């Protein structure tokens, strides 16, 4: 069990690594993430676009699960949004959802898996 001084030190350390200017990401949003990839001695940014189906909030360890369908196969990736490997996050579209986790989209195909757009 951590005492209070150790917990404060950990919180101060976490504040240094939290990205301050992230867009507000909600469940159902379509996002475009730029992920840094190192191949040999080269570094490049690869973009990953999909729908946010889950989000786990826990300060520096906040993760989002992004799902996209590529050539008829569903692909899901979990991203730490405060990771230095994430170069950029852009919200392309907001969707109207009434669930905190959209795992039911895994069983839907084609037009059935579309979400209604939410305008702000």
Swiss-Prot record:
Localization per Swiss-Prot or TrEMBL: Plastid, Chloroplast
Coiled-coil region(s): none
Keywords: Chloroplast, Plastid, Ribonucleoprotein, Ribosomal protein
Any GO MF annotation of the entry: structural constituent of ribosome
Organism: Thalassiosira weissflogii
Example GO BP: translation
Gene behind the chain: rpl19
Record-stated family: Belongs to the bacterial ribosomal protein bL19 family.
GO CC annotations on file: chloroplast; mitochondrial large ribosomal subunit
PROSITE patterns: RIBOSOMAL_L19
Name of protein: Large ribosomal subunit protein bL19c
Domain of life of the source: Eukaryota
Keyword Ribonucleoprotein: yes
Keyword Lipid metabolism: no
HAMAP family: Ribosomal_bL19
NCBIfam families per the UniProt record, alphabetical: rplS_bact
């Amino acid at each position: 069990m951590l005492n209070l001084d150790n917990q404060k030190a950990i919180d101060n350390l976490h504040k240094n690594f939290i990205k301050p200017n992230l867009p507000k990401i909600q469940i159902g949003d379509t996002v475009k993430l730029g992920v840094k990839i190192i191949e040999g001695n080269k570094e490049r940014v690869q973009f990953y676009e999909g729908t946010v189906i889950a989000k786990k909030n826990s300060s520096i360890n906040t993760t989002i699960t992004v799902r996209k369908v590529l050539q008829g196969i569903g692909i899901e990736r979990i991203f730490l949004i405060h990771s230095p490997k994430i170069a950029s996050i852009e919200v392309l579209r907001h969707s109207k959802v009434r669930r905190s986790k959209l795992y039911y989209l895994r069983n839907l195909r084609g037009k059935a898996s579309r979400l209604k757009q939410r305008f702000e």
